[in-house]
């Protein structure tokens, strides 16, 4: 559920004030992540790497109060649940957007991910969750990108993270490649 709140009564009061006056309120950070253990868990539990990575992003975000807040049209809204957005290759060769409600239950999250992404891929219809704070993600696995910079628009003001193909070394796996 989405509820308007007074930004002055939150830990984000100053950030909200600065955000509302900024022409492009965005900071882009890039970092190499060692995902060796995540890849090992993925293989051991036979869970697709991107499903597990999206679940970990949701798990981390669910423990941070600020991830439930979203500035929109000059107001601040608080959501009571999260969703993860993924980009899906569809059957026509294009891409579609798919929001997946976050749950702490990894098995349920995996089955929801598989069912929803398969449905979106087949139907070529975007699937959006309107009553949840959506964290944008994308696995651009056909590229070897190191960073994606998102241009702010008032249509997409939610947090976003994107990654390319993971890089396997002899003893380590990283996102993206270390220079």
Where are these regions (language model features)?
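Catalytic micro-motifs at enzyme active sites that drive phosphoryl/nucleotidyl and oxygen chemistry
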Residues: 15-16, 72-76, 150, 163-168
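Short secondary-structure capping/junction motifs at helix and strand boundaries
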Residues: 64-71, 122-127
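Glycine-rich active-site loop/lid that clamps phosphate-bearing ligands
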Residues: 140-164
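Broad gene-expression machinery/nucleic-acid interaction feature
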Residues: 26-28, 81-85, 134, 160
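Helical lid/core segments from catalytic subdomains that handle acyl or acyl-like groups
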Residues: 90-147
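N-terminal beta-alpha "docking/capping" segments at the starts of catalytic domains
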Residues: 1-47
């Amino acid at each position: 559920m989405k509820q308007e709140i007074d930004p002055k009564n939150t830990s984000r009061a100053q950030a909200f004030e600065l955000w509302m006056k900024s022409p492009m309120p965005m900071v882009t950070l890039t970092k190499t992540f060692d995902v060796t253990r995540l890849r090992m868990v993925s293989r051991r539990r036979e869970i697709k790497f991107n499903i597990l990575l999206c679940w970990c992003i949701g798990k981390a975000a669910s423990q941070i109060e600020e991830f439930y807040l979203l500035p929109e049209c000059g107001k601040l809204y608080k959501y009571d649940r999260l969703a993860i957005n993924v980009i899906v290759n569809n059957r026509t060769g294009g891409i579609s957007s798919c929001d997946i409600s976050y749950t702490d239950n990894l098995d349920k999250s995996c089955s929801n991910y598989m069912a929803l992404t398969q449905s979106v891929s087949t139907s070529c219809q975007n699937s959006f969750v309107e009553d949840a704070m959506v964290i944008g993600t994308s696995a651009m696995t056909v590229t070897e990108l190191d960073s994606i910079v998102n241009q702010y628009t008032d249509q997409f003001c939610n947090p976003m993270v994107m990654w390319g193909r993971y890089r396997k070394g002899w003893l380590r796996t990283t996102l993206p490649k270390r220079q």
